Amino acid sequence: MGGIILTSPGYLELLRSNKTFARLWGSNMILYIGDWFTVLAMFLLAGDATDNSPLAIAGVLAVRSFTFAPLEPITGMLADRYPRKYLMIIANLFSFVILISFILTGILDNLFSVYALTVLLVVGRAIYDPAGTAYLPTICSEEELLTANALISGGWSASMGIGAGLAGFVISDTVGKQA
């Protein structure tokens, strides 16, 4: 019926030909791996703070979900009004400073602190996600978008296993040495 047929580049071709996207994808992989590492650590910290209460551990996931929901419409408007690249950088720096502050002060031994850190990290992520999604069409051509979205989505899925696996390895190694 006369529709336009777009041909998408392959994954490696896109990463080689679009350096801006390749940098974004690489930084997203680091971000996603760190996120999943942190999520698993938050589950374990909630368990440690409560003698492994399943309710407290599930609370981390609930806090993440219930924090994202009301924030994303607001942060989506931010992504429409301000430079997306800078919002992404600010969001990551905010999350880094918050995480390091909590770690260095050693206050993650109670459930309230674990939940507070979870909320603050989600705030950073709620700023980053809509900005990143809106930024993608500005650095990729229409033909590249299908492949770019597939790489971003696949990277997120792969990072879940990598980040959680690394966290499990590091945490079990640390706990094993303390025992």
Label each region the model flagged.
Residues 22-39, 60-79, 83-98, 113-172:
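Substrate-agnostic recognition of the 12-TM MFS/MFS-like secondary transporter fold
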Residues 51, 83, 105-109:
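Helix-breaking motifs and short loop linkers at transmembrane-helix boundaries and internal kinks
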Residues 18-19, 52-53, 110, 176:
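Short loop-to-helix capping motifs
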